[in-house]
Amino acid sequence: MEAFAFDTTEQYLLAATGILLAVQAIYYLALYNRIHLRSRKAGRDDLHFSQELPPLSVIICAHEEVENLRRNLPAILEQDYPQFEVIVINDGEKGESEDYLTQLENRYSNLYHSFVPDSSRYISRKKLAVTLGIRAARYDWLVMTEANCCPQSNQWLRLLARNFTSRTEVVLGYSGYERGRSWLHRRAAFDSLFTAMRYLGFALAGSPYMGIGRNLAYRKSLFFDQKGFSAHLNLRRGDDDLFVNQVARRDNTRVETDPAAVVRMQPLLRTKDWREEKIGYASTARLYHGAQRWILGFETFSRLLFHAAWIATVVLAALHTHWLVAALGFLQFVFRFVMQALVINITAKDLDEKYRHYLLLPIFDILQPLQSLRWKLYCLFRDKREFLRK
């Protein structure tokens, strides 16, 4: 019967789709699922945590962000932690921010603030702000976050600190967005989650390659042993991802994914802000050491090939009225969609993300690599001086 017939081209397309589906399954089940596996282990008490709570310094770099400081700084200062200090390095206008920080210092004895000199040269202002904060820190353990970030709970520091074992020098945490309603926010929230599934997944697999400075801890001694940001001092960016890429190893890095240890950012208001952030990370990603970005690039490549293969299979088979072949091709798409939706949404639940991704998932699945290509093209055609220190 014609409906159950196969021709050679359709057989090749079905086989190619099946191989690409297997490749995708390996990525999702062996890499992207690791946050969920870690959460299950933590729930069963199968992970070893330190019982000590060493003193630590929280460092926040703010750039003309008095409203963000008003909104988020009290939640950081009121963490349930025995001994910690908060150091705010203010870059930009000093009037309102300076007044607010001085006012808070009268209420919180563990709050200190300083500023980036207007005359600073030869280093990016963000890296200088981080360096000033680290130099001012009294304690060895440093926790990095940003003024637009708010901890989900007062246990944030305790949960990070339970990973401060004798061998640990770097702890990677998760940062996401507060729930917003716009299309921009849905895209950014998915991108933030999927990016975390990649870099935290690799770290949990023993191959850390980057971190994000909104929820990141490392030792002050490690920073100075590595001579700070000297390896990429000429770049504006890299104070978080390039530094982690430089210092993080299998035996000195841990990951904290408890939902109470998550920090949240305000919903994005302008596409421009998100674009500039993504372009900034794209400009430094090409400098990462290790094979991780190539491995992830192959996942993206195999993903796009998979979609091309199953669509070609269904269309060609339908044109020939080979409905069995068309059904098999579509079933391979359905299988991957179900697997992908389960892994992504279970991970979102583990991280207390408010969004669940179902109907929009196929759109984001295609849109995400196209967006990444767009950021890379921006980097390619922009004036290279834009990425150098200012």
What is each stretch, according to the model?
Residues 108-125, 129, 133, 159-230, ...:
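Long helical/loop segments within the catalytic core of UDP-sugar-dependent glycosyltransferases
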Residues 300-385:
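Membrane-embedded multi-pass helical conduit in multi-pass membrane proteins
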Residues 164, 170-195, 221-224, 228-293:
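Catalytic donor/gating beta->alpha subdomain of glycosyltransferases that bind UDP-sugars
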Residues 1-50, 340:
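N-terminal membrane-anchoring/stem segments of glycan-assembly enzymes
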Residues 54-57, 85:
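Cell-envelope/extracellular polymer assembly enzymes that use nucleotide-activated donors
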Residues 40-43, 65-78:
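Short, well-formed alpha-helical segments that are part of the catalytic scaffolds
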Residues 73-120:
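Acidic donor-binding segment of Leloir-type glycosyltransferases
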Residues 139-150:
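Short beta-strand-to-loop acidic/aromatic patch adjacent to the donor-nucleotide binding site
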